[in-house]
Amino acid sequence: MSSTANSAAHEHAEKTIEADAATGAAEDTSAQLGAERGATRFDIVLGKRGCELAAPVLRAVKCLITGAFLVMRKYSVVVYCATERGLVYVDLGWTIFDQYDFLPGGSDDPLLFSVATPQNGFLLDFLCDPPKKCAQDPVLSARFLVTDSDDPEEARELLKLIVTRESGTSTKIKRAAQTDERIYMPTANSACQVALEPYSHTEITKWLGALPKDAGVKVSISDTALGLERIGCAADSVSFNAQWMDRRADRVTSCDILAKLTGVGPDAGKRSLSARSALKKLKENRVVAVHSGSGWVHSELGWPESVRVRSAQSLKKALQWLKIGAWGVPNLVFYKDKVTGLGVELSGRGEEDLWGCILFFDSEEMDDLTAQEFQEPEDCAEADYGAVSESDDAAAETHRGADGIDGADEEDSCPDMMLISATTLTQQPGRKRAPGATLQQSAQPSSPATHRKQKRPAGAARTGAGDTEQNCVHDGEASLRAPCPASNDDQEPANKRGKR
């Protein structure tokens, strides 16, 4: 009997092993199929600290990024939006994320997702909430999980955004927006960067605010000065002494600038300048520090260089918005290109890996080029994306109002920002929106061709991220330009306008 029991037990054990092996094989096959059909491309987590860093920047430019793209790269996450005359971008580096992981050996091509989606807001609304709401129900973490589509007939990747607040968790799912548009992202390789101190930032914004709404501004940089003047009225201007630095430092300090000034040093009996004393002497000497961009030689830039911005108020708003937290006042960045650009950039002062820029293209150059047919630059061909239909996103777009801007009626919103011609963003159904520019890592800013409307090939599918165009409607056509003062006697006192 004992022999019979042992035989039965042995047989049962063999069947159990076979069953376990079959189950394990099935699990392995299922896991393999899941990996093949839904492999993880990105898995990154923005923690509470990262949200607190990014929120003020994105909140400041909320009305610009409502129709933007979220660009997932191997080195950062970028929020990007382009118009025909300029662009805005916010670059979130990996160092502000709590966790980041991406599929090794994957394609280096960036993945694009439309920010302007679901019915109850847009993709990044959790970073653009008012401070009061954030304090009442703070965001604890936001997980960006990008996987390959589990549909074998669907080639686009899926983004699952999981936002965890103290009150609970919400999830948004978005398909990649492969479009026929091109995206351009500027790099740190600019022609030069002007580090504005608080005194010059305040003086410039006050001067811009006193100009008529439809006034244009020419911003110029030379070997000796940074100047801003009203277009068509050279007597109405403000200028500062430009002090070129030998090297571009990661962090610009007042003492670095003062060390370059002849005869300026610490007070008697003191080893170094106090911050208060340094700023006072900077203001007395009307000095701003200018750093040559990497790869550029100061003597070979062909100064003076200038950029004509059509909307003084747009430039003023950009300077005000990007004066944020630990970064202090933003920098003015000149780009050297066929169409010279001027950027208001939040960078180089804070220690965190977060960059923001509102960039304006030279209006005079753009006007000269609008009547010409451009050939696409050769260096743009590598970043082409095929157009695919994204009807699910197009349907979701219909919920937005006529203004096409979330929060446009708020006090701090920006109806005229970013568009150099002082425009507002409106949506017109059935119209294609202006194409963006090319995503490239070169030192050269975009060419005008990347911001011109292009005819869609016959039979090509519409893009999902912007089937309805964000058209530019000039809100200052009927206003008359204020007359230029005939002499300096008619102008405001020099202490309000700055020394000429």
UniProtKB/Swiss-Prot annotation:
Annotated GO CC locations: host cell nucleus
Assembly with partners or alone: Interacts with the DNA polymerase catalytic subunit UL30. Interacts with the origin-binding protein.
Protein name: DNA polymerase processivity factor
Locations listed in the record: Host nucleus
Biological process, per Gene Ontology: DNA replication
Composition skew (Polar residues), residue ranges: 438-449
Region: Disordered, residue numbers: 388-500
Family to which the UniProt record says this protein belongs: Belongs to the herpesviridae DNA polymerase processivity factor family.
